Amino acid sequence: MSHAQEHEQPAGPALPQTRTARHRRIVDILNRQAVRSQSQLAKLLADDGLTVTQATLSRDLDELNAVKIRNTDGDLIYAVPSEGGFRTPRAPLGESAKEERMRRLSAELLISAEASANLVVLRTPPGAAQFLASAIDQAELHDILGTIAGDDTLMLISREPTGGQALADHLLRLAQNGG
């Protein structure tokens, strides 16, 4: 191997220099460790052989819908809600811990809840809907058939044909009493 070849790739598997590969690597890093800044993320990517400019990294985070959230230590860190977000070191989540996480996030993020038949529409601050939807999904509540999230709006589907209002009331109680 020539001297030039030794410096072309980092140790480990070769990573393609495509946008998709870079996005996948960013998500992997954010799911594995707490990243507080774009410069920290750029260094972690560079350690893996992916050199990016701050502008590219900013655009990548925007395309991934990454958000900054407060972790259990109170630090603001990046998370990608659509990829399961918030994977920081903590005790394994049992049923009560998953529900507690949903309760805490409801208290922090839920602005309003309105029901119609078996549907509930939840409003959150911009960028937070997918994060709250992920917490609701992980809590695996029997009454919820599924969630759909946009930027600041979630739609929950109640398992019962007329269960939307009871579900909305339950989530509003969590938001008021939980955090």
From Swiss-Prot:
Signal peptide (UniProt feature, chain positions): none
Pfam families (UniProt xref): Arg_repressor (PF01316), Arg_repressor_C (PF02863)
Family note: Belongs to the ArgR family.
Protein known as: Arginine repressor
Gene3D superfamilies: 3.30.1360.40, Winged helix-like DNA-binding domain superfamily/Winged helix DNA-binding domain (1.10.10.10)
InterPro entries listed in its UniProt record: Arg_repress (IPR001669), Arg_repress_C (IPR020899), Arg_repress_C_sf (IPR036251), Arg_repress_DNA-bd (IPR020900), WH-like_DNA-bd_sf (IPR036388), WH_DNA-bd_sf (IPR036390)
Task performed by this protein: Transcriptional regulator that regulates arginine biosynthesis, by repression. Additionally represses many other genes including those involved in pyrimidine biosynthesis; nitrogen metabolism and nitrate utilization; antibiotic production; osmotic stress protector ectoine; genes related to hydrophobic cover formation and sporulation; glycan cell wall biosynthesis; gas vesicle formation and genes involved in secretion as well as genes for membrane proteins. Has a weak activating function on some genes.
Summary of the knockout phenotype: Deletion alters the expression of 1544 genes.
Major location (coarse): cytoplasm
